[in-house]
Amino acid sequence: MNDMKRLLSYAGPYKRDMIFGAVLVLVETCFELFIPILISNLIDIGVANGDIPYIYRKGIQMGVCALCALVTGILYAHFAARATYGWGAEIRKAEYEKMQQYAFSNLDHFAVSSLITRMTTDVTVIQNMVSAGFRPITRGPSLLIMGIGLSFYMNPRLAFVFLVCTPLLGFILSLIVRRVAPMYTKLQSMVDRLNNVVQEGLTAIRAVKAFVRDEYEEDKFNEVNTDLTAASEQTFHYAVLNLPAFQGVMYTAIVLILWFGGNMILKKQLAVGNLTGFLSYVMQVMNSMMMIANVFLLLTRSMASAHRIVEVLDEKIVLTSPENGVTEVTEGSVEFDNVSFKYKEEAKEYALSDVTLKIKAGQTVGILGGTGSSKTTLVQLIPRLYDTSRGTVRVGGKDVRAYDLAALRDAVNIILQKNVLFSGTVRENLKWGNVDASDEEIWEACRAACADEFLNRMPDGLDTVLEQGASNLSGGQKQRLCIARALIGKAKILIFDDSTSAVDTATEKKIREALAARKNVTKTIIAQRVTSVMNTDQIIILDDGKVHRIGTHAELLADDPIYQEIYASQMKGGDENGSESL
């Protein structure tokens, strides 16, 4: 319940709607509870005495009560809808804002599919609980209390008969709720698994088709889908037991009341109208119990979803800006001072160990190393995407932890290995680098990244619409747009994480020449090709998370065995500039 209370804090703007809705339900209930008394009087007085005017009068009163109940019910629906869906929107907004604050290490705690489920399905479960349960949870207790009170007012002896049945029904329903509660938690985890399989299958659909793995993916989906179906059936099997339990107790109570009431009528101790009105209250009280039981079932499932949502909201943000953090990076120097890093505190081995190096402002630095040598990990510490486990990273002479995160990351642009472009126009994507960039600045960056070569051939140019994942562009075109996006910004440091792997050597050479013209920008280039870094000011060789050697191309080629091996393997059949000999 603490999780639900936590989520209720997001209902603040809609508390007035909830209060109005609750009041309207109570008013509606009062009108409905007054009707059985009118029925009793109509039968015992009007019908028994043949008093037609009295029958008409009571009939009109019943109609007025029914109409008032209808009007208040309609008004309730208006306020309830606004409160329910507004509250859900606030929860989704809070989740999304929290996720935007996550560091990479926070995101490592959740699967992407799980986060999507928590923002959509779990919030919908909460909304369904409120939309389907708010009215019964308000109406049920009031019907129960007032119904029992009025039934005692009409006939205390009969009231004791069905009052004995009420605790029995409550006990049975509580057993069902306790049984179903853990099943709903398991059910939501199954939904996570299903969404994960669907997401992976759709994201990698081209690989699935290329390797003819359609049947394998279908089997994997069918397995998870079958597990979800089985869990749903088992949960539903227990959840629906509340209906037969309710009906069994209700019909037993009615039979007993008819038996005792019939005897009382025969003995002239009870009027027929009183018994009819009394049965109406019995039905209302039993229905109120059923309403409350259904609400508890809804609440049981929503509590599982609420816990999953609160896990997202209460995730401790690992990386935060310091109070009064430095808001400007004055120059692009980078220094690693005895830096070690591991992704998890409990990990036994470090991804980076005792890294010490200096990069001067305006320098161009290449980083080479084998697969798994932690090249990407190294550069991710510069914009503080992760914090070091030991040691200090400095940018512009200051510890990166002293900077305001937004200011630091504005000054350090990374072109990632994976080309990330969004649905929208080319212009909209490029303006991520600088939202105020003019078309002239955009085209200048495109020319530097050689993206103008294909944009000029597109009829709509910068207004060309990119499909989801930019699937209407080639790999090389995506890379060049990502490079252009980074160049549009006013970054002091540019980091290229193997960002020219999909372009040909001639295009890469043009891009390198354009970057060389940016004298005041520090360039760090992770590459697999020696030709991409051989003309840089210095080359850093990483081996198993450690700095093996730092030097220029000539120095490393002269006496470093690792560099010599990389160079020799890539330059067979080519000249020193990387051009293939024919």
Briefly describe each language-model feature range.
Residues 1-32, 39, 47-62, 72, ...:
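Membrane-integrated ABC transporters
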Residues 35, 39, 76, 80, ...:
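Hydrophobic/aromatic residues in alpha-helical transmembrane segments
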Residues 8, 13-16, 101-105, 121-130, ...:
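An intracellular "coupling" helix at the cytosolic face of ABC transporter transmembrane type-1 domains
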Residues 49-50, 85, 93-117, 121-123, ...:
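Short intracellular "coupling" helices and adjacent cytoplasmic loop segments at the cytosolic face
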Residues 26-34, 67-74, 126-129, 133-145, ...:
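Hydrophobic alpha-helical transmembrane bundles that constitute the permease/transmembrane domains
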Residues 13, 17-30, 41, 65, ...:
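Transmembrane helices of ABC transporter permease
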Residues 51-57, 146, 150-164, 234-308, ...:
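Helix-loop-helix
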Residues 327-582:
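ABC-type nucleotide-binding domain
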